[in-house]
Amino acid sequence: MAFDPAAFRRQVRMLLDRYAEEFHVPEGEHALLRRQIAAGDDIHSRRTFPGHVTTSALVLDREGRRTLLIHHRALGRWLQPGGHYEPPDELAASALREAEEETGMSGLAIDPWHRGSGLPVDIDSHRIPARPERGEPEHWHHDIRFAVRAREHVEVRPDPAEVHGAEWRGLPDLERIAPRAVRNLRRLGLVDL
């Protein structure tokens, strides 16, 4: 089945509406993404500016006490695994694929809460610096985030082409990076803080 950009925009708009209702997101929080959807921008394409959809995985251990962070090569920061959305993936599958690629881990799984709700745990739009060597101006990533569970005793083998390293960290480290995501995870009972 061919990818339909208009259907993808409708899907993201409906997700935004349901997410905003579930998590009491203030009006205007995702104004740029909503404007891009209304304008018919190809938000699925990493070449669409001023912003496009990315997905990320909030990788948690089984107890919900630790998170796996990667040291992002291009940004030089510790972040949750994630990357550009690639059609025709489902959004959650995109986040899972990115986590597996960047960490080299197998046996990761989308948290069961997502199957019941059909929602991400967070949607965050954040500024990305220009990368002239890639022909990319400063722009925005509209990051759709999913909780992902790791099996016990799975070896982490980060992809050196993508990341400098990967480490299990305490949840306060994730909270510094993605405070609203951790607040939502806590509200849903998915973490033990």
Where are these regions (language model features)?
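Membrane-topology and secretion signals of cell-surface/extracellular proteins
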Residues: F3-D4, F8-R9, R13-H24, R47-P50, ...
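Basic/polar N-terminal segments that are highly enriched at the extreme N-terminus
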Residues: M1-A2, L193
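Charged phosphate-binding loop/patch that engages nucleotide di/tri-phosphates or the phosphate backbone
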Residues: I177-L193
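N-terminal strand-loop-strand
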Residues: S45-Q80
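Conserved aromatic-histidine-acidic binding/catalytic patches
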Residues: S45, G83, R134
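Aromatic- and glycine-enriched beta-alpha-beta binding-site module
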Residues: R66-E100
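Acidic, metal-coordinating catalytic segment for phosphate/diphosphate chemistry
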Residues: R18-S56
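Unchanged
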Residues: E86-V182
